[in-house]
Amino acid sequence: MDLRQLAALTAVAEAGSFSAAARRLHTVQSNVSTHVARLEAELGATLVDRSTGTLTDEGDVVVSRARRIQHELESLRADVDSMLHQVAGDVRLGCI
């Protein structure tokens, strides 16, 4: 399981179709389909009903967890960025 697979599934859930998800991810539909299929194979569950384009119950659970993972990664990046760009030093004020 990798982040690209989770991002592809999340995009399908949000966009409503594989082709719309591909446009959102700036890739081709076959890449999105491959990522989702590999994720399904690894988990041993169908995550998207191909006839309707909707998530299965298992897909809903995976997307919910994937969103949390994506949020945590964004938070991690922000924390590290703020540490790297932290302003430090003395501030001196003078009054007359």
Locate the predicted segments by residue.
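The N-cap/first-turn positions of alpha helices
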Residues: D2-Q5, Q29, G59, A66
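Short alpha-helical "packing" element that flanks the helix-turn-helix/winged-helix DNA-binding module
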Residues: Q5-V12, V62
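Short helix-boundary/capping micro-motifs
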Residues: V12-H26
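Residues within the DNA-recognition helix of helix-turn-helix
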Residues: V28-R38
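A short LG(V/I)-centered, amphipathic sequence patch enriched
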Residues: E40-D57
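Alpha-helical linker/hinge and terminal dimerization helices associated
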Residues: E42-L43, V62-L84
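Interdomain hinge and pocket-entrance segments immediately C-terminal to HTH DNA-binding domains
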Residues: D81-I96
